[in-house]
Amino acid sequence: MLFPLMLCGISELRAEQPEGASIEFSTKVIELGELSQSDDKQIIRLTYKNIGDVPLVVLEVRTSCSCTDVQFKRDRVLPGERGVINITMDPSKAPVGSFFRVLQVVSTSTEGVERITLKAEIIE
């Protein structure tokens, strides 16, 4: 009688675990603070982890302006492993004032597209 109850618990446990690749970022909002347009380019190392149960591939990272550039590898990231997206933000190409840009990370995860926000205050 106890054995069927134990099996019910196992099936419930399996239902809670993710199926497929799932991506988890070190942060989804990157605060750069106050930057002058004459400041050097800002290099940001954004890490992510595959918290799913199959390999994950970052397919594309879309930027919303010419002041940001990204570099990443389209390698398979195995479950439990980490990957990196390098973001370069050039303050000289950003407009003066509040800076708010969204990067779209397209991957093979069950989430599909994730958004990463860059924030700064740009001064002359």
Question: PLM features: residue spans?
Answer:
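Bacterial N-terminal signal peptides
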Residues: M1-C8
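Beta-sheet-dominated interaction scaffolds and their linkers
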Residues: L13-I51, I122-E124
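Short, solvent-exposed loop/turn segments enriched in Ser/Thr/Gly
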Residues: S38-R45, A94-V102
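Buried hydrophobic-core signal for structured, non-transmembrane domains
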Residues: I44-N50, I87, R101-V106, L118
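Short, acidic/polar linear motifs in exposed loop/turn regions
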Residues: I51-V54, K93, S109
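Surface-exposed binding patches on compact interaction domains or structured appendages
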Residues: D53-V84
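Short, hydrophobic beta-strand segments
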Residues: I85-K93
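Terminal connector regions
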Residues: P95-I123
